[in-house]
Structures are given as C-alpha cells and as structure tokens.
Amino acid sequence: MHPSLRIQFLVAGFLTGFALTTISSATGASSPIGLWKNEDATFEIFENDGKLGARVVALREPTTPEGKEKTDIHNPDPSKRDRPILGLVFMSGFVKRSDVRWENGTIYDPKSGNTYSCFMELDGPDKIKVRGFIGISLIGRTDIWTRAKGGEHR
C-alpha cells in the first residue's frame, strides 16, 4: 500500500471515530436526565433552573398494608407528613462537575425523614451511582440506579 494512501486511511478512521464520539455526546449519552429505577421505585431526573433534581414517579408498593397511599410520615415537619410519596421531589440542587458527575445536591430519605448531601455519577449510559452522605462523602451510602427502559434523555 502506498504511504500516502495509508495516511489517508488513518486520517479517515480518526475522523470517523471523532464524529461518532461527538454524535454520542450530543445525543445525551452522558446525561442523567430521564427515568431511572432501583428495587423500590422509578425516579425522574429533571433540570430546573440549570440544576438537576429528581422526583418519585412510581413505587413498587404504592400503598400501605391497609391499602392507603404512602405518605411522608417520617418528615420532621409535621405539616408535610400527609404529602404523597408518589410525585415527591426528593433530590435537588445538583450542579454539573464533569461530563459524568453532578455535585452539591441534597437527597431526602422518606423512610427516615433525613436529608443528606449527595452527588451523582454516571457509570456508563444505563447506570448511575447516587451517594448520600453526612459531612464528607466517605461516610455515606451509594445506591446504583439503572436507566428505565425508554427513559433515555430526549
């Protein structure tokens, strides 16, 4: 193969790879916006005023054993204990740190009524690590969510 032809193939291959990477980034492959789930619920991560938040959109068990809608019974504010868990905005304030990480947010745990500092980090296009912590991130818990089918960023 002639050396100039080899260089042309290398340049064409490089440009094709660069174009595919650019298209992948532009289509939201690195965006957490959309639907996510864990073993208990489905969540929607959304953008509001340039920051990310999340709300509960479905529960595996939406009612109590008595058949009543689950409410925020552990909230430290008694006036909020009757609000439904379904639709609850429980994460807020996340700012983008990198293409895969959002920080400086908070996460509210309706099972305990506690609010924690939090960050999110994408682990590929279909997994996100959500870490809630007190003080420093070494003291906390990480939950892994998977992107819900059809929940891609559009």
Listing of model-derived features with the role each one plays in the protein:
Residues 41-42, 133-135:
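Short beta-turn/strand-loop junction motif enriched in small, turn-promoting residues
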Residues 32-33, 38-117:
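Central antiparallel beta-sheet cores of small beta-barrel/beta-sandwich binding domains
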Residues 10-22:
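Bacterial N-terminal signal peptides
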